[in-house]
């Protein structure tokens, strides 16, 4: 026996139906009357559709809904050909469009963008054209720099630069050798120093041709590159200097006993014609020779050897002033050279050479404590 019917089996609990019937003995007296059964006329007026027709109508409605759903979805677009390489490996750019009226496409083959209804853009991915523009722009200044350096090396100013800045032609701004500036545009001007040849001329060793080229109308024709080192190396070149004004010996010096050859008057013109050789200092050194009288000149004995040589060396105070013996005067001065060397080793004053004192020692003549016979003395300079 089931547990739900224990009370009913014992008779303790009445069934629910009996309890309800006992509470309401008139079943029709309740306010909630059941609805009347449908009449036959109503059933005749309302036809009942067959179940097969209803199933067909439901299937048609579901098919119409699916068709509208398919039409709403965009059809898969056909791949467009690239206008550059005519490749079909293209794609539509969803997130990189400029406007919806002109959709943007990208070609994976040539890596170019183009817009529908617009022009093809020659801009590759990664900015390659920008790099090309930078390289092309950097080529222009490099070409200009190379042109300027070549113009500077050749030593000529470009026409455009000369027209913009005419000072370049006059001041020689392109010249890198500042020690010897070029004299551009000074051919018509009178030379400032007529006796000094141009240091830039290639004919420095030819004084006559050099002066003619420097002072003539075509002075720039012989101008060449001549550096300071070449000037120092050319010891054999003959560079004349302007004539120095003759200085007479003051009377007070002669009265005091100073026999300075430098203050004596120059020799007469007849003697100058015989002594045509000119030293590197520009004035004749033969004025202090043996025929000039007493006293010793520093460059007196040097003139005998220098008048025979066509090209002498620049004489400075620190050089050895030993006279150069020529072939003609070798016999006359052979004894003097020996005395000169002996006096130089002894450290005394000048020795007597052919009637006059040997050069190279100024201490006896300048100080006055020496004699013409070579007595007394100090260290030679």
UniProtKB/Swiss-Prot annotation:
Please verify whether the record's keywords include Zinc.
yes
GO terms of molecular function = DNA binding; DNA-binding transcription factor activity; zinc ion binding
* Cellular localisation: Nucleus
Instruction: Kindly list the ranges of residues that form Dof-type zinc fingers according to the record.
Output: 80-134
Pfam families for the chain: Zn_ribbon_Dof
Print the keywords alphabetically. DNA-binding, Metal-binding, Nucleus, Transcription, Transcription regulation, Zinc, Zinc-finger
- Does Transit peptide show up as a keyword for this record? no
Instruction: Please provide, in alphabetical order, the Gene Ontology terms of the cellular component aspect for this entry.
Output: nucleus
Q: Where are the transmembrane segments?
A: none
Q: Region entry Disordered: which residue ranges?
A: 19-81, 329-349
Q: Where does Zn(2+) bind?
A: 82, 85, 107, 110
Q: List the disulfide bonds.
A: none
The residue ranges flagged as biased composition, category Low complexity, are 23-32, 40-59
Residue ranges with Basic and acidic residues bias: 68-79
Under InterPro entries, the record lists: Dof (IPR045174), Znf_Dof (IPR003851)
Biological function: Transcription factor that may transactivate seed storage protein genes in developing seeds.
Q: What is the protein name given in its UniProt record?
A: Dof zinc finger protein 2
Q: Which organism is it from?
A: Oryza sativa subsp. japonica
């Amino acid at each position: 026996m089931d547990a739900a019917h224990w009370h009913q089996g014992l008779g303790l609990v009445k069934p629910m139906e009996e309890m309800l019937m006992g509470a309401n003995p008139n079943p029709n007296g309740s306010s909630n009357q059941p609805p009347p059964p449908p009449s036959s006329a109503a059933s005749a007026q309302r036809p009942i559709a067959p179940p097969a027709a209803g199933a067909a109508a439901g299937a048609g409605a579901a098919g119409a809904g699916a068709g509208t759903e398919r039409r709403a979805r965009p059809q898969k677009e056909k791949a467009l050909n690239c206008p550059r390489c005519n490749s079909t490996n293209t794609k539509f750019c969803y997130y990189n469009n400029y406007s919806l009226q002109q959709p943007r496409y990208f070609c994976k083959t040539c890596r170019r963008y183009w817009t529908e209804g617009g022009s093809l853009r020659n801009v590759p991915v990664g900015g390659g054209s920008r790099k090309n523009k930078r390289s092309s722009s950097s080529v222009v200044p490099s070409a200009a720099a190379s042109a300027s350096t070549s113009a500077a090396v050749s030593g000529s100013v470009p026409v455009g630069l000369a027209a913009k800045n005419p000072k370049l032609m006059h001041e020689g701004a392109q010249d890198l050798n500042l020690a010897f500036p070029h004299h551009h545009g000074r051919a018509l001007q009178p030379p400032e120093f007529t006796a000094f040849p141009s240091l830039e001329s290639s004919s420095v060793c030819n004084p006559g041709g050099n002066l003619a080229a420097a002072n003539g109308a075509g002075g720039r024709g012989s101008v060449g590159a001549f550096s300071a080192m070449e000037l120092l190396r050319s010891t054999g070149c003959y560079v004349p200097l302007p004539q120095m004004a003759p200085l007479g010996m003051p009377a007070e010096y002669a009265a005091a006993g100073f026999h300075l050859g430098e203050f004596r008057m120059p020799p007469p013109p007849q003697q100058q014609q015989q002594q045509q050789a000119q030293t590197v200092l520009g004035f004749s050194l033969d004025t202090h020779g043996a025929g000039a009288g007493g006293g010793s000149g520093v460059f007196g004995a040097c003139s005998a050897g220098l008048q025979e040589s066509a090209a002498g060396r620049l004489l400075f105070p620190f050089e050895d002033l030993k006279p150069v013996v020529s072939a003609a005067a070798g016999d006359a001065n052979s004894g003097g050279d020996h005395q000169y060397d002996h006096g130089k080793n002894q450290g005394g004053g000048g020795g007597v050479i052919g009637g006059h004192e040997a050069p190279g020692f100024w201490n006896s003549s300048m100080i006055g404590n020496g004699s013409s016979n070579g007595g007394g003395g100090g260290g030679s300079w």
